[in-house]
Amino acid sequence: MSNITMKELLEAGVHFGHQTKRWNPKMKPYIFGARNGIYIIDLQKTVRLFKSAYNFVFEAAQAGETMLFVGTKKQAQDSVAEEAQRCGMFFVNDRWLGGMLTNFSTVKQSIERLKRIDAMFADGTIEAYTKKEALQMEKERVKLEKTLGGIKGMNKLPGLLFVIDPKNEEIAVSEAKKLGIPVVAIVDTNCDPDNIDYVIPGNDDAIRAIRLLTSKVADAMIEGGQARNTQLQTDTEGAEFAAGEETGEGTVAEA
């Protein structure tokens, strides 16, 4: 089971919060102190709370739930896309479209449009269109891919969200809250932790800090998925064995 150490957190700069003049008083329980006008996050609490978040994500994956990674700020974009893809999950790393969760049926129509255009370019159907029409479709495809590419395979609402900087992603958090979708988030000293189900206190601006925490959350999804597959395989083998036993008993009785 993946773990996170104090050394890893320190090396990645997870303990550095925002300037003391830019803070949310609700984050006070997670703050160790201040140094040179910067709040220092209590990493002992980060370790403990990360463990709770990890266990939750692991259990969700084990139960077959899907997760949506959300991080549209520049520092988070690469980590969000890479780690979501590594664990076979979905992501939004460009712009959160209002209604992406609360109006998912409409968003799905745009996803289907993107898939259709992709298919046209893949099978050569696009050649039946004029050069101008093909160019317009390519522009539409690029635009849709940028905003919806990370959720192209998401056929239903996710079971949970992992968010980097809930202050920046407040619309996503609000939509998840309305729908009762649990939120796990990296929460810095300037954020409101109230709408977050699993708070991970930490630096949400440094690329190294974001990458470390995001990769560990992806590990939880992978390990939970592996545990699910093992359990399903065990259940299948058990059912096959039981069926074989029944067949064997019938043969003996007939003999």
From Swiss-Prot:
Name under which the protein is recorded: Small ribosomal subunit protein uS2
Cysteine-cysteine disulfides: none
Classification via CDD domains: RPS2
KW Ribonucleoprotein (keyword) present: yes
GO CC list: cytosolic small ribosomal subunit
Pfam families, per the entry: Ribosomal_S2
GO molecular function, a single term: structural constituent of ribosome
Keywords: Ribonucleoprotein, Ribosomal protein
Organism the protein comes from: Geotalea daltonii (strain DSM 22248 / JCM 15807 / FRC-32) (Geobacter daltonii)
Keyword Ribosomal protein in annotation: yes
Taxonomy of the source species: Bacteria, Pseudomonadati, Thermodesulfobacteriota, Desulfuromonadia, Geobacterales
